[in-house]
Design a protein with these regions (language model features):
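Short aromatic-enriched loop/helix-cap "lid" or pocket-rim segments at secondary-structure transitions
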Residues: 16-18, 47-51, 100-102, 126-130
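Hydrophobic/aromatic beta-strand patches that form the interior of the parallel beta-sheet core
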Residues: 36-38, 57, 115
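A short, charged, and often flexible helix/loop element on the N-terminal side
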Residues: 44-78, 90-92, 129-134
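Histidine-centered beta-alpha loop that forms part of the nucleotide-sugar donor binding/catalytic region
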Residues: 8, 92-93, 117-122
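Residue-level recognition of beta-strand->loop/alpha-helix junctions
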Residues: 39-41, 60, 122
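Short N-terminal targeting/anchoring amphipathic segment
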Residues: 77-98, 112-115
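N-terminal subdomain of nucleotide-sugar transferases
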Residues: 1-44, 82-83, 110
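Membrane-proximal helix-turn-helix segments that form the acceptor-binding/catalytic region
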Residues: 26, 74, 98, 102-110, ...
């Protein structure tokens, strides 16, 4: 079975979440799945959506790059359908918004199974800045 492990951020080698994701991908592969990883790469303010180590979509830099990385998800849908991906495993990262919901609906209409991992720890108290609280508010709305 072909699967896509979809995350909405990049990898940091010293980060525990990044290590967990890499172990999850490894475990899925050991179970016989053909797993590809979709993630964001941001170097020097330049943003790209990656599949494994290949650029799926170059969003550029600046405000346009920041907006595109959040709202442009059609490249992911196109890749999934072209590659006949049967399962998408998404890791939630404050990305509950109309664009993500629309992407999931499109995939489900095409028969793609979608699983979303949602962190269960009480993270609300960890958000102290206005920007963090805004992310949390949007996440709660959708």
């Amino acid at each position: 079975m072909k699967a896509l492990f979809l995350i909405f951020h990049g990898f940091e080698e010293a980060n525990g979440i990044s290590k967990k994701i890499r172990y999850q991908v490894k475990a899925l592969k050991e179970c016989g799945m053909d797993v590809h990883t979709c993630y964001l790469n941001e170097e020097n303010g330049h943003k790209c959506r990656m599949i494994d180590n290949h650029t799926l979509r170059d969003y550029g830099s600046g405000i346009k790059g920041k907006l595109r990385k959040r709202f442009e998800l059609q490249s992911i849908v196109k890749y999934i359908l072209q590659e006949n991906i049967q399962l998408v495993y998404m890791r939630s990262y404050h990305n509950a918004n109309p664009f993500t919901i629309s992407m999931v609906k499109q995939l489900k209409r095409q028969g793609v199974k979608v699983v979303m991992e949602i962190p269960t720890y009480p993270y609300d108290q960890e958000y102290i800045t206005r920007r963090m609280k805004l992310d949390l508010l949007v996440d709660r709305c959708f």
